[in-house]
Amino acid sequence: MTGHAPLVGVIGGSGLYKLEGIEPVESLNIDTPWGRPSSPITLFKLPSGPVVAFLARHGVSHQFTPSEVPSRANIAALKKIGCQVIIAFSAVGSLREEIKPRDIVVPSQIIDRTKSVRPCTFFEGLGVVGHAMFGEPFDTELTGLVTKSIKEAVTGFEMNDRIGVHAEKVAICMEGPAFSTRAESNMYRMFGGDIINMSVLPEAKLAREAELSYALIAQITDYDAWRESEEPVTVAEVMATIAANVSVSNRLTLTILDEVHNAVAKGQLKTCKGTMEYSVMTKKEMISEESKKTLSFILPYFS
């Protein structure tokens, strides 16, 4: 890797397979103890000069289902190249009338409705037990900065590009790949969910274990299946909304990345560095050298 390490990593969701309008400077293929990421990591140079890292969650050809995404490799690779912060994008369904297609949500909480088929911890199979603090699943300082940045950017848009911006919402993460039944969609509403997707977990948990600050930018594409007055969501509907929103998304992304990078570089964001050091229950002298080597890929104090 040439030049300065990227401080900010971007994980692109459905429809976001690269960063438009900025210069790619390098493509990296990173091997991790948990395999290779879902795509090469591309380093992009922002117009203001800094470099950011990007990978496509589902692969450049969208070949990984939500259950197949190699999230451990994705997070580990971004940590290895120097990222301290992850901004993740995801196409999501709305569970609330007031959260409309094309709106953006920066959630603050998650309800896990996955089915334990996705590897969800870096400690599995290593003879090591770690318990990450996860009461606030998204970094609160980072989500605050991202929300502020988006709201300020949106006020400068032309009227036909105006979108709603929502914060402090609850994301449901379901297994997929099929969409919800109407009954499930209504159940998630009763749970208190505001949006629904298939990707935020285990991504957010793994980011916490790797001591990376993590925020999700959720782009609303549909109303899921709870509205009896219309047909349930389809892939065609999702992709049509993404296509209609692509220019807005690109402008927002550049603004957000600049502001987040500057905040990290100036020490204005408290990062998650060191948060896992006292979250491991297993005595260090009882951990095998092989396991220490594996974990040191993301947590240097195992070296």
Curated annotation (Swiss-Prot):
Annotated site residues (Important for substrate specificity) in this chain: 180, 235
GO biological process: L-methionine salvage from methylthioadenosine; purine ribonucleoside salvage
Binding site for phosphate: 14, 57-58, 90-91, 199
PROSITE patterns with a match to the protein in the record: PNP_MTAP_2
Glycoprotein as UniProt keyword: no
Catalytic activity line of the entry: S-methyl-5'-thioadenosine + phosphate = 5-(methylsulfanyl)-alpha-D-ribose 1-phosphate + adenine
Positions contributing to substrate binding: 198, 222-224
GO molecular function: S-methyl-5-thioadenosine phosphorylase activity
Chief location category: cytoplasm
Record keywords: Cytoplasm, Glycosyltransferase, Nucleus, Purine salvage, Transferase
Gene Ontology CC: one annotated term: nucleus
Xref: InterPro entries: MTAP (IPR010044), Nucleoside_phosphorylase_d (IPR000845), Nucleoside_phosphorylase_sf (IPR035994), Purine_phosphorylase-2_CS (IPR018099)
Disulfide bonds: none
One matching Pfam family: PNP_UDP_1
Record's subcellular location: Cytoplasm; Nucleus
Pathway(s) annotated for this protein in UniProt: Amino-acid biosynthesis; L-methionine biosynthesis via salvage pathway; S-methyl-5-thio-alpha-D-ribose 1-phosphate from S-methyl-5'-thioadenosine (phosphorylase route): step 1/1
Entry's EC annotation: 2.4.2.28
Family indicated by similarity: Belongs to the PNP/MTAP phosphorylase family. MTAP subfamily.
Subunit structure: Homotrimer.
Role of this protein: Catalyzes the reversible phosphorylation of S-methyl-5'-thioadenosine (MTA) to adenine and 5-methylthioribose-1-phosphate. Involved in the breakdown of MTA, a major by-product of polyamine biosynthesis. Responsible for the first step in the methionine salvage pathway after MTA has been generated from S-adenosylmethionine. Has broad substrate specificity with 6-aminopurine nucleosides as preferred substrates.
UniProt name for this protein: S-methyl-5'-thioadenosine phosphorylase 1
Organism listed in the record: Puccinia graminis f. sp. tritici (strain CRL 75-36-700-3 / race SCCL) (Black stem rust fungus)
